[in-house]
Amino acid sequence: MKYLALAAAAAFSIIAPSVSHATTINITNYSFSTGSQDGLLHLTAGGPFNNTTPSFGQFKLTGTNVTAGNTPVTFFTYCVDLANALFVPGAFTVEPLSLLFSPTQATNMTKLLANVASPVTADQSAAMQLAMWEIAFDLSASQDVQSGGTQGDFWVTSGSSSTARTLANSYLANLTTWSVPAGGNAYLLYNAQNQSQIFFAAVAVPEAATWGMMIVGFGVVGATMRRRKQAYRLA
């Protein structure tokens, strides 16, 4: 089954089965973990999701760890890819953020995941995804999810996400003072033809031959693209 989905999520921790670099994860299902909000997305650089109105919030991804003998796994992830739709089921590999992002982007994404409390409302969940998209796709000097217009800008207007947009900007404003905790890092669930996701691991992800580690997963999962009479998903 193919879902046009924009993965969106806010930080939420779980204890998940072991994963490692080069681990293959097969995702078979997803849902919003704490609800969602919607808004009109703008990307000055264009792309398939420019001027679309998805719902966004933290996603709960479930599936199996293929490398570990199809052990059941659960991740909470955020979308970091607005160029691909999410296909479920779909296979992903665990990769470093450097595969897609600059050192500054990777650091800020990790700070965001490590310092924002687990969401308990739809606004908190949506705010986390918006802040993640701002880091990933806004290349302007000012990070503000509510304004834009220069090349590389990302911003959001209208919809039910007004509170989430304000909250997202408060997260972004704290990036200069937040730090990355020792022993934790963010990683990608990556597929070049599928929609890549980001999650946070409380301890370093070991090499492929090392098992038995528990991680804390964070994430965004696909958002429901909504038009008034037609719904379709991005993720």
Where are these predicted regions, by residue range?
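Short, surface-exposed polybasic-aromatic patches that bind anionic ligands, especially phosphate groups
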Residues: 23-202
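Short, threonine-centered small-residue motifs that mark membrane-proximal processing/anchoring sites
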Residues: 2-8, 12-24, 196-225
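Sequence-pattern detector for short linear motifs
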Residues: 5, 168, 229-231
